[in-house]
């Protein structure tokens, strides 16, 4: 047997991506806020000015939208059992202003008290908390999840006839 030289590798050559391409790659996976996208680009070694320009370009072309991002966060967190206080705080960490946060919270079409009741039913069964200790645990759970006092009070009272 004769030895042959290994065939040259035929693969894709790596081309350096532009800041816009890097940002678009992040946006394809999931929505990002402008602040979050800018921070991620800078963490990947892109100059702050180039990162900001890329984010602004994608926002101008409709690829990035803070309102759409915020509405998506509200929808996802509400369906995961989080309350309005938690969601507002999370949106604030993404660098959204109070107007965008309020607009996103207004897109929620459900009832926060009903969401709290659903969460309690999932954790404590259909009958809900039966004694005072379980009611306290349920109230603590709802408070940790970011529900307001009124929703907690109504959800932990748990009168099925009401």
Swiss-Prot record:
Cell compartment(s), UniProt: Cytoplasm
Primary location class: cytoplasm
Pfam families: RecX_HTH1, RecX_HTH2, RecX_HTH3
GO cellular component terms, A-Z: cytoplasm
InterPro entries: RecX_HTH_1st, RecX_HTH_2nd, RecX_HTH_3rd, Regulatory_RecX, WH-like_DNA-bd_sf
Domain of life where this protein originates: Bacteria
GO aspect biological process, one term: regulation of DNA repair
Key words of the record: Cytoplasm
Function field: Modulates RecA activity.
Family: Belongs to the RecX family.
NCBIfam families in UniProt: PRK00117.2-1
This protein's name: Regulatory protein RecX
Species of provenance: Xanthomonas campestris pv. campestris (strain ATCC 33913 / DSM 3586 / NCPPB 528 / LMG 568 / P 25)
